[in-house]
Design a protein with these regions (language model features):
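Gly/Pro/Ser/Thr-rich low-complexity, intrinsically disordered segments predominantly at protein N-termini
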Residues: 1-115
Length: 115
């Protein structure tokens, strides 16, 4: 659910959230994220392992990251997301903060309670 505010939020507002509070920033609006369930985490770990092993066994140059992993979708930092799994093949998109620009592939696990 987005915060009811007319203002446009920025990445600085995300950074100012209390430790442990997870949220995404989409078009300047903050969306809080519920902690993932045990089932969600288990499935995410399995999928992550399969993708990572496939990339390694095929000597791929792509890198795979599991959430929390920052993806900044625009240069103005009005959109910041944390996909469950991100695959990035262009090393120029990666820096110490995470990924700037769209990953080559993402996996988002949606549970019935997310709807």
């Amino acid at each position: 659910m987005a915060l009811p505010k007319e203002d446009i939020y920025t990445i600085e507002d995300i950074y100012a959230l209390p430790d442990g509070e997870r949220a995404e920033l989409i078009d300047g609006q903050i969306y809080y994220m519920a902690p993932p369930s045990r089932k969600h985490q288990k499935l995410s770990g399995e999928i992550f392992g399969i993708i990572r092993e496939y990339i390694r066994s095929n000597h791929g140059a792509c890198e795979v990251y599991a959430a929390p992993f920052a993806v900044y979708l625009d240069e103005h930092t009005n959109t910041y997301v944390e996909p469950d799994i991100s695959v990035i093949c262009d090393p120029k998109k990666l820096d110490d903060r995470g990924c700037t620009g769209a990953p080559d592939w993402i996996v988002e696990i949606v549970s019935p309670s997310s709807k």
